[in-house]
A protein has these predicted regions:
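GH16 jelly-roll
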Residues: 1-127
Length: 127
């Protein structure tokens, strides 16, 4: 969901209706009055995403943002909004189920509860 912050890097966006697909997106707001989003609508393949633990990673450099799924490069973004220092960013893991038709698809409430286990989340900064 867009916010009034400078922007966000979505490490992973996932809805149960997507089965073996996920999304990686970049949103920027404060320095872009028209709001821009990069590739949130593109679904990336993820073999057995609903089974076991998986590693999602983001590397943000001065020229690009790289997303990884289980150690494999899944997406590269080199467009507007990448340069470090252009604005602050929030890092997100988006797991928001919906009870109605929406971006995540149509849900059947009888399928609930959904569950996701997180072992750890780490953040590092390059020196």
């Amino acid at each position: 969901m867009p916010s009034q912050s400078n922007g966000e890097i979505d490490i992973v966006e996932y809805f149960g209706t997507w089965k073996n697909r996920w999304s990686a997106a970049l949103h920027w707001f404060a320095w872009n009055p028209n709001y821009l989003c990069s590739s949130g609508d593109d679904k990336l393949p993820a073999e057995d995403i609903q089974k076991g633990y998986h590693n999602f990673s983001v590397v943000w450099t001065d020229s690009a943002i790289y997303w990884y799924y289980d150690g494999e490069l899944a997406r590269v973004y080199e467009g507007d909004g990448v340069a470090k220092g252009s604005a602050g960013m929030r890092l997100l893991i988006q797991l928001a189920p919906e009870y109605k038709d929406g971006w995540g698809g149509t849900y059947d409430p009888t399928d609930y509860p959904y569950q996701m286990k997180t072992d750890y989340i780490k953040a590092y900064q390059f020196k």
